[in-house]
Every structure is written in C-alpha cells, then in structure tokens.
Amino acid sequence: MQESGYVPLKIADPALLFAELGRQPLPGMSLEEMADLMADLGEPRFRAKQLFQWVYQKGVKDFDAMTNLPARLRQHLAGTTMLRLLEKETEQHDRRTGTTKYLFRLADGSQVESVLMRQSWGNSVCVTTQVGCRMGCTFCASTVGGLVRNLTAGEIVDQIVMMQRELPQGERISTVVLMGSGEPLENYDHVLKAVRLVHDPEGLNIGYRHITISTSGIVPGMRRLAEEGLPITLALSLHAPTDELRRQLMPVARIWPLAEVLAAAREYGEKTGRRVTYEYILIEGVNDGPEEARQLARLLKGALAHVNLIPMNPVAERPQYRRPGPERVNRFKEILESNGIATTVRREMGGEIDAACGQLRNRAQRKHMGR
C-alpha cells in the first residue's frame, strides 16, 4: 500500500548496467545462481561452491588464483564475467582510532564510501547502499547532489569483501552496518540479497545478529523487514523528539509522524526479539538541550530501545550546524539514563579523516569539477 505523500523510488534496476557492459557480475550471485551458471556451462554442481568461496570468502581479484578450477573454466569466466565490481581510489587512515575510510569507484564511474573500524573486540565495517541519497536530511553530506542510483547486491557485498582483503591474514570482519550513504530500505531487494550473501556460511559467514540496517524511517520498509523473520538489528535515525523539529531536520518526517514510525519500530522489536537502536545526532542549539532529552525519554519509555548519541561531525556543506561540547553531550546522556533508557555515545572516528558520511565522495567530485 502506498502511504499518503510517499512516492516509492522508481529508477532503473542497477543490474541493467552490467547487461550493458556485456559481462555477468559474480558478486551478487547466490550459491544457487552460481550452480545454475555451472550447469549452463556443463560443469558439475560442486564447482559452484568452489567459485562462491573464491568470490566471497577468499575475495580474489584474479581468476588465475582460483587454483581448484580447471583452466578452461577460469578462461571462460575471465572472458564473460566480472570478478570484482569496485576499484579502490583512495583511503584515509586515523592512526589513533584504527579507522580507515575508503573511496571506491564503480564500473560506471560512480563513487561510494565505506569505513573499516578495527577495534579490540573485532573488526566492523560501515557500507553504502546507494550512490547519493534522496532523503534530504539537512545535516547530512550524503544528500548533497541527491540520489544517483541504487547499488546492486554485488556492489554492496563487494565493499565488505574489498575491506576484508585489507585486513592482516587471520583477521576477519565480524560486524556489518548498512549505515553509509543512502536509504537502505529504498533499495530493499538488493539490500536483503546482500545481507543473505554476507550471512552465507560458505561466504563471509557473518551472523544476522551482527548485521545492522539503518533507516530514516521508511515505515513500509520497516514493516516488510519485520516480516522477514531475520534477527537483524534495526537502527532508526530519529534525531528529534518532536514532529515539528523532526520535519525541519528530515523531510521524510513530513510523510510519517513520529507515532507511526515508533509504532513500526516497536512492531519490529516484537516480531524479531531484537532491541531497536535509535540514532540521535546531537546538533548544538538545535536538538541537544535538557528539554529535548526529557522529551526523548518520554517518547521511548517502555520500549525495547537503545539510544546511540552521535555528536555532529563537521560537514563543509552544512556550516550552519555545529557540534556540541562534551558537557552538553554528557548531560543529554545522563538525562536519558536517569529515565531508564540505555544510552551510548558513538565512538569518535577521529580528526585525521573526513568523518561525516559523504564527505570524501563530495570532495572528490569537487576536485573532478575543478572547484
């Protein structure tokens, strides 16, 4: 059912891009699809599992590395398929936090950002689901320039595979968050296929409970995801405790009021048994005061909830918004916790990289345009 005022995203399927290139992308194919490919080539079914592992688990960049495949098959695949869908353009390191941000180029020349965070408990990655974004959140760099296109499931998964390759031998990615540029629930089919591929034991083998999907509050998508029966963590970008303020910050709030968004979030928690994470960006003088904290506490009272506070990262394209000082951040957190709301403050990426999502891509585009 179409919600009043909401026009579902209607753009060409990104998979058509590869049809135009005349090569079939291997990233994005399920084990069953690879089995069909092998059958079409007259190969035994077990070759599909071998190929699947080379593409996802081992992440090789050259068909010659697939040593357990016959030379004739490797040669055929090299001429008719694409093994990797991304090319690393640049990277930024923050030595203090062990965070690396990557800028990848896609087959059509588009660029996307991904982040690898190395931590004591494991390695996590933040990946992008769209080139650009049409949500129009006023504090976000990703929306500058609007939406270009959806990513395919293969392009989403390949970000993870490429970052897995960057880790020392013996280390692996343990947590995936789909919280980069774009609205994942507007690219639902490709995102869900990517999640299933990431989970596959023959591939990256990352448990559903270690995968998070973020949304700005696309209510039909939230309800649909709840019906999937997957124990994925849902992260809802809330960012304001009232409809009036949320509409100012997030155009999507003009379609679904807070009551409807929160009802969908509670439904998700009830159906999956997973605690919903509420993302809340703190903007100095806009939504970071004690009254906003008390309003947020009342809003989430009794819900299976965890609030993740995100002090505003500087965004060149959004100079009107500033980051609050530590005292205001801590005061906001204390008010929530005193009301029984589990709350954390997001770990800093650090000042050595463009921390805000979308910054690296925007800078590269400005450089390309000579600005």
UniProtKB/Swiss-Prot annotation:
> Which reactions appear under catalytic activity for this entry?
adenosine(2503) in 23S rRNA + 2 reduced [2Fe-2S]-[ferredoxin] + 2 S-adenosyl-L-methionine = 2-methyladenosine(2503) in 23S rRNA + 5'-deoxyadenosine + L-methionine + 2 oxidized [2Fe-2S]-[ferredoxin] + S-adenosyl-L-homocysteine; adenosine(37) in tRNA + 2 reduced [2Fe-2S]-[ferredoxin] + 2 S-adenosyl-L-methionine = 2-methyladenosine(37) in tRNA + 5'-deoxyadenosine + L-methionine + 2 oxidized [2Fe-2S]-[ferredoxin] + S-adenosyl-L-homocysteine
Q: Which UniProt keywords apply?
A: 4Fe-4S, Cytoplasm, Disulfide bond, Iron, Iron-sulfur, Metal-binding, Methyltransferase, rRNA processing, S-adenosyl-L-methionine, Transferase, tRNA processing
Give the residues the record marks as binding [4Fe-4S] cluster: C133, C137, C140
Domain (Radical SAM core): residue spans on this chain: 119-352
Give a GO molecular function annotation for the protein.
metal ion binding
Q: Which GO terms describe its cellular component?
A: cytoplasm
Per UniProt, the cofactor note for this protein states:
Binds 1 [4Fe-4S] cluster. The cluster is coordinated with 3 cysteines and an exchangeable S-adenosyl-L-methionine.
EC annotation from Swiss-Prot or TrEMBL: 2.1.1.192
Coiled coil stretches, renumbered:
none
Q: Name one GO biological process term.
A: rRNA base methylation
Listed cofactors? [4Fe-4S] cluster
Q: What class of enzyme is it?
A: transferase
Q: Where does S-adenosyl-L-methionine bind?
A: G182, E183, S214, S237, L238, H239, N313
Where does this chain mainly localize?
A: cytoplasm
Q: What is the annotated localization of this protein?
A: Cytoplasm
Q: Sorted alphabetically, which InterPro entries does this protein's record hold?
A: Aldolase_TIM, Elp3/MiaA/NifB-like_rSAM, Methyltransferase_A, RlmN_N, RNA_MTrfase_RlmN, rRNA_lsu_MTrfase_RlmN/Cfr, rSAM
Where do the catalytic residues lie?
A: E113, C357
Quote the Pfam families the UniProt record gives.
Answer: Radical_SAM (PF04055), RlmN_N (PF21016)
Free-text function comment from the UniProt entry: Specifically methylates position 2 of adenine 2503 in 23S rRNA and position 2 of adenine 37 in tRNAs.
Q: What else is known?
A: Reaction proceeds by a ping-pong mechanism involving intermediate methylation of a conserved cysteine residue.
Q: Which HAMAP family match?
A: RNA_methyltr_RlmN (MF_01849)
Family named by the database record? Belongs to the radical SAM superfamily. RlmN family.
Name-wise, this protein is Probable dual-specificity RNA methyltransferase RlmN
Annotated organism of origin: Symbiobacterium thermophilum (strain DSM 24528 / JCM 14929 / IAM 14863 / T)
